[in-house]
């Protein structure tokens, strides 16, 4: 039995999800087939299925953190091209790999990058932000206990700089708190990176 015969059987049986293929050499053919037929392809065996970047029917399971970091940074650079970025350093930093990697990528692209501690005064932040129109805030903590401090700091910035638009980058652990913090998440124009689903 060859791959074409197997895919023909899959199509005839109206399959909704396809787990595999096992061999990376089959990824291109199977992902194209899945796109053409509206079948979701779940790849549990490899983190190198580049098709996930261009085919909304391809899903990766067990994606290594290194690959997630690269995908998140790529998506950030595409979504927020040309925006100023504030890295907010907290006392509960648990995302240094991601924030440092993102910071390096932004600097290579010539983006305006500002670093500030969560205990910085409003005067210090106003000076650092220098009346930028739209600022993307990236905290270095995904811990929910740091979330309230981040919201408080952004509220202070919003009051002191009413003409500045703020957007917040969040982490998937925050989704568990969406009922509790729904208003603040919307107010802060929050974008949450999550490994649960990725559609470029």
Language-model features, listed with the residues they occupy:
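Glycine-rich, charge-decorated loop segments at or immediately adjacent to ligand/cofactor-binding or catalytic sites
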Residues: 51-59, 121-126, 174-188
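Short, well-structured alpha-helical segments in soluble
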Residues: 2-16, 123-131
């Amino acid at each position: 039995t060859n791959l074409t015969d197997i895919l023909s059987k899959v199509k005839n049986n109206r399959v909704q999800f396809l787990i595999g293929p096992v061999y990376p050499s089959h990824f291109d053919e199977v992902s194209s087939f899945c796109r053409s037929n509206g079948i979701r392809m779940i790849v549990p065996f490899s983190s190198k299925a580049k098709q996930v970047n261009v085919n909304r029917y391809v899903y990766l399971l067990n994606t290594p953190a290194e690959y997630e970091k690269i995908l998140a940074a790529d998506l950030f650079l595409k979504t927020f091209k040309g925006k100023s970025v504030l890295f907010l350093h907290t006392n509960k930093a648990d995302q240094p790999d991601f924030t440092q990697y993102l910071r390096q990528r932004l600097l290579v692209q010539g983006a305006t990058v500002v670093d500030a501690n969560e205990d910085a005064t409003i005067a210090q932040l106003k000076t650092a932000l220098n009346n930028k129109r739209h600022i993307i805030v990236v905290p270095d903590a995904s811990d929910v206990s740091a979330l309230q401090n981040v919201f408080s700091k952004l509220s202070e910035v919003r009051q002191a700089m009413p003409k500045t638009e703020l957007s917040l980058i969040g982490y998937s652990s925050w989704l568990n708190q969406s009922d509790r913090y729904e208003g603040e998440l919307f107010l802060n124009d929050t974008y949450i990176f999550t490994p649960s689903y990725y559609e470029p």
